[in-house]
UniProtKB/Swiss-Prot annotation:
Protein name: Vacuolar protein sorting-associated protein 52
Functional summary from the UniProt entry: Involved in retrograde transport from early and late endosomes to late Golgi by linking the vesicle through the t-SNARE TGL1 to the Golgi, leading to the membrane fusion between late Golgi and endosomal vesicles.
Species of the source: Schizosaccharomyces pombe (strain 972 / ATCC 24843) (Fission yeast)
UniProt cross-references to InterPro entries, sorted A to Z: Vps52 (IPR007258), Vps52_C (IPR048361), Vps52_CC (IPR048319)
Entries under PANTHER family matching the protein: SUPPRESSOR OF ACTIN MUTATIONS 2/VACUOLAR PROTEIN SORTING 52 (PTHR14190), VACUOLAR PROTEIN SORTING-ASSOCIATED PROTEIN 52 HOMOLOG (PTHR14190:SF7)
A GO-annotated cellular component: GARP complex
């Protein structure tokens, strides 16, 4: 029994060893498989890495190809004229915005042909670009031809009678100013010829229309004015009725009874002709109407020249003189005739103040080309104002008023009221004046001649007290009137008459 059991044990151990050997064999097979798999995996990994590198290279090449295609595509597109562009430039409506846009595209084509980049040089060598360049040049010449005709037609419009130049210039020239710039860039000689044609046309235009305007203003009844002395037989202006001449005579020396401000709404025009024919006008309204119309045209023309022709500072003065020289000469001639026949010192001084205001506005609005005209007008008006004031003074010196002693009363003389009105008006028109002007000297001479006249008038009375009372009342009237206005001139004249009055009081 015991031997049998031991034999069984040995038999069992043998089986286990066999199984272990089998497992080892299997394990060895597995290890061999794993080793082969690792080798295969390393090979596969190496292949994948190679594929990835190749893929990256392909992607880089693809991107480079796309970049080249994009660049070449742009060059090709830039070298080929679109059919609609050719049609628009050749036959399109030049007043339509599309023509302006087409001209900008054509300019891009023309400027693109001058590209000196390496890619541009490479492409310019292509036969297709050479052919397109010929077509672009032909289209450029067509555009130049049409622009020339367009501008010529516009300039001819300005030579039509009663034409309103402002809307034509705004809608046909300013709105399409790129047309002239294109012409100036690609055919400067023709552009300068058209500029000269415009200058010659506007030279004629302004001279013609201001000659017409002067004929219209010649129909206006202008109040010429009168001297300050009292005359029983003072003649009316333009054969006015007695009531009318008295009314205007009383207003000639009073600035407050005249229109105060002048602007484009107060300009004398054909539409106001009915009112003008029935109502005489003060000289300053005619003068200011003329200067306002002239200033309006000059300012508009100056702005147009700068915007459309893009002139330099030296060219501005030259072109402006070429356009307005004859007109300004005619203007000075007309104003000389208008003012030289007037003895309305208030109207002339108002014209001076208005011109000074225009000169200041010209500096503010940066229109320097018109300043010499204003300066020449002021230099002409001042001597005329002084001459008229001399007439007033001479009138007072030559006034031969004879009064009876009983007529020397405490009431101021009627002439004192007129002198007071004149001094008041001169002071009102000189409120803001700080520099020495001919007005102050003329006013002083007038006051002195007036005082001399009053003193001579009193010599017919032996009663010194009555003389002093009469003179004092006249001096008081004038100083009281001058109290209503400020400024150096008013203060100077008021002080003068107050001192005269004070001396009379001390004498009494």
């Amino acid at each position: 029994m015991q031997r049998a059991s031991t034999q069984d044990v040995y038999d069992g151990s043998g089986d286990d060893l066999n199984k272990l050997d089998s497992l080892k064999s299997v394990l060895n097979d597995v290890l061999s498989s794993l080793e082969r798999f690792q080798v295969d995996l390393d090979v596969a990994t190496s292949d994948i890495y190679k594929v990835s590198e190749r893929s990256n290279k392909i992607q880089v090449n693809l991107n480079n190809l796309k970049a080249v295609e994009s660049a070449l595509g742009a060059e090709i597109d830039g070298a080929i004229l679109p059919p609609d562009l050719i049609k628009t430039i050749s036959t399109g409506d030049m007043d339509h915005p599309s023509w302006n846009s087409a001209l900008e595209k054509l300019t891009s084509f023309l400027e693109g042909g001058e590209d000196d980049s390496s890619l541009g040089n490479m492409f310019n060598s292509l036969q297709i670009n050479k052919d397109q360049k010929k077509l672009v040049d032909k289209l450029r010449d067509k555009a130049i031809e049409r622009i020339r005709n367009y501008i010529v037609v516009t300039i001819k419009m300005f030579r039509q009678a009663f034409v309103d130049v402002f809307p034509i210039r705004k809608h046909r020239l300013i709105a399409n100013k790129n047309y002239y710039l294109f012409l100036f860039k690609f055919n400067r000689k023709l552009a300068l010829e058209l500029q000269r044609a415009y200058i010659n046309t506007m030279n004629w235009f302004y001279l013609y229309h201001f000659e017409q305007y002067s004929r219209f203003l010649d129909k206006v009844h202008v109040l010429k004015g009168e001297t300050i002395r009292v005359e029983e037989d003072r003649k009316g202006l333009f054969n006015l009725s007695k009531g009318a001449q008295q009314s205007y005579g009383n207003q000639m020396l009073s600035v407050n009874l005249r229109p105060q401000d002048f602007d484009m709404n107060s300009v004398l025009t054909a539409s106001t002709m009915h009112h003008i024919e029935s109502s005489p006008q003060y000289i300053e309204r005619v003068y200011c109407s003329w200067e306002l119309v002239l200033t309006e045209h000059v300012s508009s023309e100056y702005a147009f020249l700068l915007e459309y022709f893009n002139l330099s500072k030296d060219q501005q003065a030259t072109v402006f003189a070429a356009i307005f020289e004859k007109t300004l000469h005619f203007s000075r001639k007309y104003i000389t005739g208008l003012i030289s026949s007037s003895i309305d010192c208030i109207g002339i001084l108002k014209s001076i103040r208005f011109t000074q205001k225009l000169a200041l506005q010209a500096q503010t609005n940066i229109v320097p080309v018109i300043e010499p005209h204003y300066n020449s007008m002021i230099l002409f008006l001042w001597p005329r104002f002084q001459a008229v004031m001399d007439m007033h003074c001479e009138s007072l010196r030559k006034t031969n008023l004879s009064v009876k002693p009983e007529e020397i009363t405490s009431r101021p003389h009627p002439l004192s009221q007129r002198v007071a009105e004149l001094l008041y008006s001169l002071s009102m028109l000189s409120v803001n004046v700080v520099e020495a002007e001919p007005v102050a000297r003329s006013a002083s001479r007038l006051a002195q001649d007036y005082v001399s006249m009053l003193q001579n008038l009193c010599k017919t009375v032996n009663d010194k007290r009555r003389q002093s009372r009469f003179l004092s009342n006249n001096y008081t009237l004038i100083s009281t009137v001058l109290s209503g206005v400020s400024g150096n001139l008013a203060i100077e004249q008021k002080t003068y008459f107050e001192k005269l009055n004070e001396n009379l009081t001390n004498f009494q």
